[in-house]
Structures are given as C-alpha cells and as structure tokens.
C-alpha cells in the first residue's frame, strides 16, 4: 500500500486519536452495513474503549509496523498455511493483502469471506471458526 496512507493515519492519531478510533472502527466492522446485524454498538464501543485506554505513544509507534514488507519472508514459509480474509475489508483490501499473501506462500489455502470486513473473527465468527477447524483437521 502507498506509504502516504500510513502517514495520514499517524497525522490523524496526533491530531485527535479518539476521532481516529471512531472512524477506524466504522471501517473495521463496516458498521454502515453490519451494525445491528453482525456487530452491536456495544461491541464497537468496547473496542473503542480499549483503544482509547492505550498509550498514545504506543498507538502512534505501531503504525510503521503495519507497512513492513514481508513478501520475501512469505516465500520461505514451509508449513501448512490458511489465509482467510473478508472481501469487503476496508482497512486492508484483499487485493493488497490476502490474495497476494496466498500466492506468495507455497501451497497456501485461501478462504474468502463474502462481504466480510476487516474484523471477520467477530462479524463472521461461525464461518471463520469453521474454516479454521476444517484446515486444522487436514493439516
């Protein structure tokens, strides 16, 4: 992804991290589509509360780790690997991450969660858990 995206995140965190968290979690869960259906307002608020309680310094310092280039490392993975991601991920689009990751890891199994946002472990837990259990049975 373009490095300017991460610079923008850092600027937003410095300017008003609480406002940043509010916007971030809207896209983390795709609340415009899934709020009240697959995620509750309380679950979103609980995540916001955890983020708001985190160190401002740590929140800012973790952003550069999000764009570390691990592509060379992925080509050396030699264990069974499941890559699972939502096709509606607004935080890290599947074309920029999951699809590429699955191609770089030899023999990786790709599972795409239809209409899944970034936090598929919450919004699509049954499907994610089913995929994980099936993968582990075969691994």
Segments the model singles out, each with a brief description of its role:
Residues 78-79, 107:
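Active-site acidic short loop of glycosyltransferases
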Residues 1-15:
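Flexible "cap/lid" loop of the alpha/beta hydrolase fold
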